[in-house]
Amino acid sequence: MDTRIKRIIAREILDSRGNPTVEVDITLNNGIRGRAACPSGASTGIHEAVERRDGEKRFGGKGVQGAVQAVMDIISPKLLGRDALEQKSIDSVMIELDGTPNKAKLGANAILTVSMAVARAAANSEDVLLSEYLGPKSTLMPVPCMNIMNGGAHANWQGSDFQEYMIAPVGAPDYPEAVRWGCEVYHSLKSVLKKKGLSTGVGDEGGFAPIVPSNLEPASLIVHAIEEAGYIPGKDIALVLDPASSGFYKDGKYTLKTEKKVLTSEEMTDYYEDMIRTYPIISIEDGLAEDDWEGFAFMTKRLGNTIQIVGDDIFVTNPERIHRGLKEKTANAVLIKLNQIGTVTETIDAIRLAQKAGWGTMVSHRSGETCDSFIADLTVALGCGQLKTGAPCRGERVEKYNQLLRINEFLGDKARYAGRQAFNSA
């Protein structure tokens, strides 16, 4: 079978927020095709690889025709005739073509989408699942961390200061049951909110986004919903937080508008410690801001033996920044987002670097998503054990959970559910 690249086509499509994004189709000489679409974040770290947007009147400046043309006019001529099975070589060519440290010239949205489409075309050509192609011996199914209450930028700052309140069915016996448990709690929470006269409208990621009096209230509501659904908080289902603290960090302080508090890094750590004592929290992501290295190290030293401390914006899936984090003991886990670094190869390198050091790895969607389920396969392939991809609501979120159900079915008796052990220090 001739797996050399014959044709590359890029186009502008819409993401889940109605904003343009890049989609790429790759056809190999054997006639096999691969398609991929790029996600986009709402709360983006300043150190992330750069999305290329047109900045013109159409789509309010968010068009991606320039990124599409970069694929067609610059990337495609250099990749035609190359073997799709040589992922690392293809990604290296695109990185060299761009020539910037953050992919600002061609755009991470152009480069990544091609990189993903190449991997999918290669997997299709080998007639295997993408997860099997990227990780032939991997059988670990992840804990689905479902974002069932939204705040911060994901809810237009109408509710909690904290961006995501997730549930993690750590006590489930397998992945399909974990999904069922999560769905039942999600529907239970909707009933709880209705009874309290709170809004059941959903945010970008499918979670509910009611106006609440404090950042603790969503956790209380979720614990109530877990109990109403017939599960034991902490034992069956734990809580996972992503405050996305860079969004309320300014001049060295953290401003919690919901509670009219202005706190230092140490005081924020105290705040989280109090939350952990009250609620069954197993993991906190971006509890402090993206450049608060000293604060992160303090928080990890203080809380890292009790819960998982995840770095997202501080690491941006970048091996160089993860290296620094390992040296300074900044966290004990890293969030993985494909479009933060911009190629499949670099993403895999970041995951393996963290795993080799004993850190936890949680793969993540973005708030502006498509129905591409690449991250579901990636999570299993690399044995990450944790995936967050929104609530069990909205098609672009549910598609990832559904793809994992298919992978679990394919693995059969070989499938192993990660459970509580996936979370560092939990």
From Swiss-Prot:
A Pfam family matched in the record: Enolase_C
CDD domains hit by this protein: enolase
The protein's name in its UniProt record: Enolase 2
Record's function text: Catalyzes the reversible conversion of 2-phosphoglycerate (2-PG) into phosphoenolpyruvate (PEP). It is essential for the degradation of carbohydrates via glycolysis.
Subcellular locations according to the entry: Cytoplasm; Secreted; Cell surface
Active-site residue numbers: 205, 337
Main location: cytoplasm
Reactions catalysed: (2R)-2-phosphoglycerate = phosphoenolpyruvate + H2O
GO molecular function, one term: magnesium ion binding
Residue sites binding Mg(2+) per the record: 242, 285, 312
Cofactor mode of binding and number, as noted: Binds a second Mg(2+) ion via substrate during catalysis.
Enzyme class (EC, first level): lyase
Binding site for (2R)-2-phosphoglycerate: 163, 337, 366-367, 388
Family note: Belongs to the enolase family.
E.C. number: 4.2.1.11
Pathway as given in its UniProt record: Carbohydrate degradation; glycolysis; pyruvate from D-glyceraldehyde 3-phosphate: step 4/5
Cofactor field: Mg(2+)
One Gene Ontology biological process: glycolytic process
Keywords noted in UniProt: Cytoplasm, Glycolysis, Lyase, Magnesium, Metal-binding, Secreted
InterPro entries in the cross-refs: Enolase, Enolase-like_C_sf, Enolase-like_N, Enolase_C, Enolase_CS, Enolase_N
GO CC list: cell surface; extracellular region; phosphopyruvate hydratase complex
Lineage of producing organism: Archaea, Methanobacteriati, Methanobacteriota, Stenosarchaea group, Methanomicrobia
Organism: Methanospirillum hungatei JF-1 (strain ATCC 27890 / DSM 864 / NBRC 100397 / JF-1)
